[in-house]
Amino acid sequence: MLKSFLIFLVRFYQKNISPAFPASCRYCPTCSTYMIEAIQKHGLKGVLMGIARILRCHPLAHGGNDPVPDHFSLRRNKTDISD
């Protein structure tokens, strides 16, 4: 039930708050979609993964493809980093 509520909050952000700002996420999937997928896959640990992802998303980040890993990790997928 807590997972559903957290996902509801992210979807509320996606539909009602995010459209008011220009697109700025440097990753695919977007940080909010990543948060939802991480919560679905890893439960409450997924919230930590989503927060870590948001902290990595800044103007100096390379961005690119960074899917939710199958195992819990607060770091970016090393196999998906493109130089």
Swiss-Prot record:
Could be involved in insertion of integral membrane proteins into the membrane. Belongs to the UPF0161 family. It is found in: Cell membrane. HAMAP family: UPF0161_YidD. InterPro entries: Membr_insert_effic_factor_YidD. This is Putative membrane protein insertion efficiency factor. Keywords: Cell membrane, Membrane. Residues 63-83 are annotated as: Disordered. It comes from Streptococcus agalactiae serotype III (strain NEM316). It is a peripheral membrane protein. Residues 68-83 have a biased composition (Basic and acidic residues). GO terms for cellular component: plasma membrane.
